[in-house]
Amino acid sequence: MATKLESSLIFALLSKCSVLSQTNLAFSLLAVTIIWLAISLFLWTYPGGPAWGKYLFGRLISGSYKTGNVIPGPKGFPLVGSMSLMSSTLAHRRIADAAEKFGAKRLMAFSLGETRVIVTCNPDVAKEILNSPVFADRPVKESAYSLMFNRAIGFAPHGVYWRTLRRIASNHLFSTKQIRRAETQRRVISSQMVEFLEKQSSNEPCFVRELLKTASLNNMMCSVFGQEYELEKNHVELREMVEEGYDLLGTLNWTDHLPWLSEFDPQRLRSRCSTLVPKVNRFVSRIISEHRNQTGDLPRDFVDVLLSLHGSDKLSDPDIIAVLWEMIFRGTDTVAVLIEWILARMVLHPDMQSTVQNELDQVVGKSRALDESDLASLPYLTAVVKEVLRLHPPGPLLSWARLAITDTIVDGRLVPAGTTAMVNMWAVSHDPHVWVDPLEFKPERFVAKEGEVEFSVLGSDLRLAPFGSGRRICPGKNLGFTTVMFWTAMMLHEFEWGPSDGNGVDLSEKLRLSCEMANPLPAKLRRRRS
């Protein structure tokens, strides 16, 4: 048995060892912290910021580093990179300014936390990216995954499943035949809008945004579910779900780019997705059940088409819900946003509004209502819509980015697999080297002279491709453009649009999922046609 003295000595020795261990632990933690900060600062010094520094440092270690392959771009801040570029409601403008500053309009690199990003403000490089099979995939953000969009056309990985969805949608929803079949519903909805606008007092400003969003939602519900949706009864619940989805998908989620934040959900986006998805499931599942209980041999609408698929094309119920939810979600925003921008420009430029209305009166007259077949004879109105798409593209960054699935070369620079690629269509459409007087509203630039080919905005010319290009081009581009043309023509044929006061029109913008007017457009209406 140890003596009292021995026990005291052992205790003293253990105490010293304990103190020594604590000191070593503290020293080790301090050393690790210093090394971590030093590495972070070192990686941050590379062009493009920390994510690019990490990649380039790895190539330097492996001996494959080449100075000429470095893509210029902002460093941003240590660890987070240039998150501030994308956190802004004017991200497209900030990115354009950064590209100008770094002389990198053709190709610029920047970091979103640990995510490598390239962006181009050049139409030739944009075509190279969008038409390359290497960029056939999209980066799936946590919000998109949580909202089930990874199983729908927009975010599904490029492959057999994606091609199946694309083919089904193209044949049964977005084909020329289906667009023509849906003409009646668009006319009915346009008549409802006219009736609503007629009831507005000519002495009070009319705010058309909510009407356009409601009409767009109704139109999409008709296209997808084959019958008029009772908006008066249920539109509040559905509008709230769609608006919440827009907000979630349009918000830069820090945990997508800073994995060490994922456990904390600092922006509460995951929590909000978890609240929204059960509501969406219940809503869409109820409609699917109603269709299953209906009798009939031939598919009547898009839901019936999806339910009738068999063999390798057959979709599970969760996949059907994801596809239908995306159709509702994506089809209700762009049309409303774009028409509001067009009407704002018509209020701001009454002389051009008169030109459009004179064209309508010559083609349609005032004795009858507009018909969709009249649209082909309205070149100036078509030019107005294209010019608004140029100045105010709803998706200035083409909404959703692309993902490099392998190492590739873009504009002579090496772009590694896993890099996110973006096209700043707003910067392209405002570039004085691409467009004459790019800040001026000049619809006549799109009026084809005799012998000229009409300028297409449907993806073939990357000077203006608001619907994208290549494999991931928007499948509903023709339907969307037709709807915008018809409803805009109807509103300008039936009403004269004027400013609500003497303060002009506020053209300030806000980028969410789409780039919309920061404040709803107020206008005073005067009936043109009795």
UniProtKB/Swiss-Prot annotation:
Cofactor: heme
Record-linked SUPFAM superfamilies: Cytochrome P450
Primary location: membrane
E.C. designation(s): 1.14.-.-
Effect of disrupting the coding gene: Reduced seed size.
Transmembrane segments: 25-45
GO CC terms of this entry: membrane
Membrane topology per record: Single-pass membrane protein
Keywords noted in UniProt: Developmental protein, Growth regulation, Heme, Iron, Membrane, Metal-binding, Monooxygenase, Oxidoreductase, Transmembrane, Transmembrane helix
Cited CDD domains: CYP78
A GO molecular-function annotation: heme binding
Intracellular or extracellular location(s): Membrane
Binding site for heme: 474
Xref: Pfam families: p450
EC top class, as a word: oxidoreductase
InterPro entries with a match to the protein in the record: Cyt_P450, Cyt_P450_CS, Cyt_P450_E_grp-I, Cyt_P450_sf, Cytochrome_P450_78A
Keyword Isomerase included in the entry's annotation: no
Tissues and organs where the protein is expressed, per its UniProt entry: Expressed in leaves, sepals, petals, stamens, carpels and developing ovules.
Misc remark: The gain of function mutants eod3-1D (T-DNA tagging) show increased size of leaves, flowers and seeds, but defects in reproductive development.
Family: Belongs to the cytochrome P450 family.
Reported function: Plays a role in seed and fruit development. Functions probably in association with CYP78A9 in the regulation of seed growth. Acts maternally to promote seed growth.
PANTHER family named among the record's database cross-references: CYTOCHROME P450 78A6, CYTOCHROME P450 78A7-RELATED
Record protein name field: Cytochrome P450 78A6
Species for this entry: Arabidopsis thaliana
Designated gene of the protein: CYP78A6
